[in-house]
Amino acid sequence: MGYLLLPMEGKTTPATHSYASRAILFAWALCLFSLPRQLAADPLTSRALIDQPAGSNEPFGLVMEKVATGPLVEKWLQIQREIDDERLTLKICEQSRASCPRTSLQFFSIIQNGRKLEGRARFGEINRSVNLRIRPMSDKANFGEDDFWSSPLTTFARGAGDCEDYAIAKFAALQEAGVSSDDLRIIILRDTIRQTHHAALAARLQGRWLMLDNRRMIMIEDRQVRGYQPIFLLHRRGISLFIGDLRISSSALKPSFHVRGGE
């Protein structure tokens, strides 16, 4: 299941399906070629299938430790501030579509479509729409930087982004569509087969965590994930490091530790 490109739920035309498949394949390939040097020097010991010990309500059921400071925390706080600032633009779009910038209107339309649905259908609509609207592109090609986290409206204005940009856009869209931030997590994971890193959104529905990934249209539960090992969890209250049964070097726990998500 880990690397199969699954078809979209619902009806699609052959042209739409072909485009979507090519886009996902390209996004999947792009993410494989960005291994953070900080982690590459000290890889994690991991399994293909993630176990879920009892006693945790977070994705993957693993124990976590809060990360208080460091570049990753600063980067996430900055993105949250930008998401909050962009709510003003979305409010303008809600009051007058004619006054809404075109690319902002695209993002707002995804939110509106999500609001019309509930539960899994809402998650699926936003997952598919964001996956199709954003072209996969590395930070280097898009911004001229090795690591740049883009706010949702910036990503939509560019029409392109890497895996954490997809996850950030879905995080913001689901919040605006009515999903509590308590039920949303951005997960930074290690691809244990390709030895690279990736980011995806986890959304909780009726006590179960669904993975919204730019590599696939179909959402799967965290317990079904294969080929990934979770490392960091980003949520409204901050960042946590998955510890559980993982063996991570002491350098990973230092405040200055920095992870760059894959493209």
Task: Cite the ranges covered by each PLM segment.
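Bacterial N-terminal signal peptides
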Residues: A23-S34
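Acidic, Ala/Val/Gly-enriched low-complexity intrinsically disordered segments
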Residues: A15, A20-A23
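A structural boundary/capping signal
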Residues: G2-E9, P14, R37-E263
